[in-house]
Curated annotation (Swiss-Prot):
InterPro entries: Thioredoxin, Thioredoxin-like_sf, Thioredoxin_CS, Thioredoxin_domain. It comes from the Bacteria. Residues 2-102 form the Thioredoxin domain. This is Thioredoxin.
Length: 102
């Protein structure tokens, strides 16, 4: 399951209740985001030990600014609320699963 993040408060609650969180920062107009989104969802269905979330940067500009998102798609892995890995551009399901399994 992929959770759509709609506020900084919701994001904080997600961090508080999950050890590992991976977030796909995306936008409707972003071509590579349209390819990455389904891959991200497939990875989420395979890995139950990590919280998967998406942030639409056009709707949640405060979150995008807080995490300095300047390119799309950007996938960020957090452990205990701290950024551990950041990847920019298309990422296939296998790479996402590999990343969260480390």
């Amino acid at each position: 399951m992929v959770t759509e993040i709609k506020s900084l408060k919701q994001l904080g609650e997600l961090f508080a209740s999950n050890n590992k969180v991976i977030i796909d920062f995306w936008a409707e107009w972003c071509g590579p985001c349209k390819i990455t989104g389904p891959e991200f969802a497939k990875a989420a269905s395979e890995v139950s030990t990590v919280a998967f979330a998406k942030v639409n940067v056009d709707e949640q500009t405060d979150i995008a600014a807080a995490y300095k998102i300047t390119s799309l798609p950007t996938i960020v892995l957090f452990e205990k609320g701290q950024e551990k890995h950041r990847a920019i551009g298309f990422m296939p399901k296998a790479k996402i699963v590999q990343l969260v399994s480390q």
